[in-house]
Swiss-Prot record:
Species of origin: Mycolicibacterium paratuberculosis (strain ATCC BAA-968 / K-10)
Annotated active site: C127 (acyl-thioester intermediate)
Gene3D superfamilies: Dihydrodipicolinate Reductase, domain 2, NAD(P)-binding Rossmann-like Domain
Claim: Ligase is one of the keywords in the record: no
Name this polypeptide is given: Acetaldehyde dehydrogenase
Statement: the UniProt record of this protein carries the keyword NAD: yes
Annotated positions binding NAD(+): S12, G13, N14, I15, S158, A159, G160, P161, G162, T163, R164, A165, N166, N277
């Protein structure tokens, strides 16, 4: 019986390379292939040195191989994944999508991972979503949250051309996730590209409107519990200080507010530690892949008995 799921990484850029190092440490995932389109790609060269089979001939090469992966992690672009996703599904390959394509349901591990373990395709939403939606979820599971607003500040040098070209998509997708996964009735997302040099690590502020008579101790405890859960796969995720509670005011629209400040320091596997915004995407994707693999391997083992 196999003890690890066979994995292909589609894409050979910075995120794919950082993801590779995380997958190599996994007890549940075995990276076997890296697929790119540039024969001179540094990511493909690194993957070859680490023992993976590589190609610059794209997804069609992977799908033509006699042995197929169980899981594909795709870190290319939205239009590439939208084209490839039906091919993966037809081949019986599960897909974890790190692009904005959103073909399948969006997943935030502490909030809704268990609901989508059998989905053929899951989407990792955005870096801002992975960092902030867990906090909104932590509050909304204790009290009603009529409005939540998140502000994600990331080092400008960590934002590549894809992020810059899709700022509007980032804010819309993250805002929607604050509502549909975080549990807020209305959500808003803002991203700031911080030009500071030396670069600052990712910092996020999460505002949640709450009832005036809310149990503040229960909310604070729920936030701490979720932070600990995120730290199991992103050790550099931490609260900057205790959640801050404010009474209703004109500035808050007459509602009480809890404000949470977090920062995300990357593990430094391939990307620099200040790029916590990218690290949390690869770490969360690895976590999702591991849980899918555990579930799949357990089901396979049960069926074999």
């Amino acid at each position: 019986m196999p003890t690890k799921a066979k994995v292909a990484i589609v894409g050979s850029g910075n995120i794919s390379t950082d993801l590779l190092y995380k997958l190599l440490r996994s007890d549940w995932l075995e990276p076997r292939w890296m697929v790119g389109i540039d024969p001179q790609s540094e990511g493909l060269a690194r993957a070859r040195k680490l023992g993976l089979e590589t190609t610059h001939e794209g997804v069609d090469w992977l799908l033509a191989q006699p042995e197929k992966p169980d899981l594909v992690f795709e870190a290319t672009s939205a239009y590439v994944h939208r084209d490839a996703a039906p091919k993966y599904e037809a081949a019986g390959i599960r897909a974890i999508d790190l692009t904005p394509a959103a073909v399948g349901p969006a997943v935030i591990p502490p909030a809704n991972l268990r609901q989508h373990l059998d989905a053929p395709n899951v989407n990792m939403i955005t870096c801002g979503g992975q960092a902030t939606i867990p906090i909104v979820f932590a509050v909304s599971r204790v009290v009603e949250v009529p409005y939540a607003e998140i502000v994600a500040s990331v080092a400008s040098v960590s934002a590549g051309p894809g992020t810059r070209a899709n700022i509007d998509e980032f804010t819309k997708t993250t805002s929607r996730g604050v509502e549909t996964i975080g549990g807020a009735k209305r959500g808003k997302a803002i991203i700031i590209l911080n030009p500071a040099d030396p670069p600052m690590i990712m910092r996020d502020t999460i505002f949640c409107a709450i009832p005036e008579d809310a149990d503040r101790d229960a909310i604070a405890q729920s936030i701490h519990d979720v932070v600990k859960e995120v730290q199991t796969y992103v050790p550099g995720y931490r609260l900057l200080n205790e959640p801050q509670f404010d009474e209703p005011s004109l500035n808050s629209g007459g509602q009480a507010v809890v404000t949470t400040f977090v920062e995300v320091e990357g593990a430094g596997d391939y990307l620099p530690p200040y790029a916590g915004n990218l690290d949390i995407m690869t770490a969360a994707a690895t976590k999702v892949g591991e849980e899918i693999a555990k579930e799949t391997l357990a089901t396979t083992a049960g069926g074999a008995q």
